[in-house]
Amino acid sequence: MSYQVTIEPIGTTIEVEEDQTILDAALRQGVWLPFACGHGTCGTCKVQVTDGFYDVGEASPFALMDIERDENKVLACCCKPQSDMVIEADVDEDPDFLGHLVQDYQATVIEIKDLSPTIKGIRLQLDRPIEFQAGQYINVQFPNIEGTRAFSIANSPSEVGIVELHIRKVEGGAATTYVHEQLATGDQLDISGPYGQFFVRKSDDQNAIFIAGGSGLSSPQSMILDLLESGDSRTIYLFQGARDLAELYNRELFEQLVKDYPNFRYIPALNAPKPEDQWTGFTGFVHEAVADYFENRCGGHKAYLCGPPIMIDSAISTLMQSRLFERDIHTERFLSAADGAAGQSRSALFKHI
């Protein structure tokens, strides 16, 4: 059995299967409702029901308060129709967003390598090509682990049927521990995607600043490769932050890109280099490297930030103090399952601040 859900004010009607959430059905039919966590904890996908019956699902009482439930508000990521419905949603349409349909795929692990002492690089061969926009992510289901995990795609969309992931081991994390200790080449995984609205605004030709920390390098790497491969002429800056030299992974890749593309700049920063690193580059946090490089004058750029929340917050503060407008800053916050247990989203948050 399926139900018809009409989304106002755009007037689009989608078909939602029994036991399927409104959000999942919408994304699979090319309607990109606003969302972030996908687990009922952040409230980004809140919509107003104007007609129909439904199961509100496992929405957090913090994300959907009792008074909102009484007003027939629901979270699209949790709500399952029990009749035809009409909802009102704030659908943000961006001309640069391609809106590829979310689909299910079977993936085979074809390569596993150590990118750093704490980060694995995983390459997957999919059962058919996937269309995605550089900066987006996939959800991965691991054997005998409840729920899916979100990981950003690190390779360029030009690699047909291939998905590269950078996965940091999280202390106590079931999925990342499985990846680091049990996953092997030849293993098969169920994935779905693409998800997310973290992407380059190509119609805006301002120079681009990418700021990445830890495994948050994955999305910027994909976006930078895509821009350079397409012949984009804007100046592209990558500021990569790490603790020490061992954690500064893929450095050789970006140093080669500097040689190959005159419009690409690479500025790595280590906040705690070891004596044996013999580090001569910038020492300090990555947001401090940005302020130092641009001498606190970042106006006239677009900025794309990806990494842990504390890095994102520091970088936003630095950029705005350096005269970059809020509308020109786009972020992807990496949160682990442990963060979710503390009441935050369990997946990456993708937003324009």
Curated annotation (Swiss-Prot):
Its cofactor is FAD; [2Fe-2S] cluster. Pathway: Aromatic compound metabolism; phenol degradation. Keywords: 2Fe-2S, Aromatic hydrocarbons catabolism, Electron transport, FAD, Flavoprotein, Iron, Iron-sulfur, Metal-binding, Monooxygenase, NADP, Oxidoreductase, Transport. Residues 102-201 form the FAD-binding FR-type domain. [2Fe-2S] cluster binds at residues 37, 42, 45, 77. Binds 1 FAD. It catalyses: phenol + NADPH + O2 + H(+) = catechol + NADP(+) + H2O. One of its GO terms (biological process) is aerobic phenol-containing compound catabolic process. Pfam families: FAD_binding_6, Fer2, NAD_binding_1. GO terms for molecular function: 2 iron, 2 sulfur cluster binding; metal ion binding; phenol 2-monooxygenase activity. Residues 3-93 form the 2Fe-2S ferredoxin-type domain. Induction: By phenol. SUPFAM superfamilies: 2Fe-2S ferredoxin-like, Ferredoxin reductase-like, C-terminal NADP-linked domain, Riboflavin synthase domain-like. CDD domains: fer2 (cd00207), phenol_2-monooxygenase_like (cd06211). Catabolizes phenol, and some of its methylated derivatives. P5 is required for growth on phenol, and for in vitro phenol hydroxylase activity. Probable electron transfer from NADPH, via FAD and the 2Fe-2S center, to the oxygenase activity site of the enzyme. This is Phenol hydroxylase P5 protein. It comes from Acinetobacter pittii (strain PHEA-2). The lineage of its organism: Bacteria, Pseudomonadati, Pseudomonadota, Gammaproteobacteria, Moraxellales.
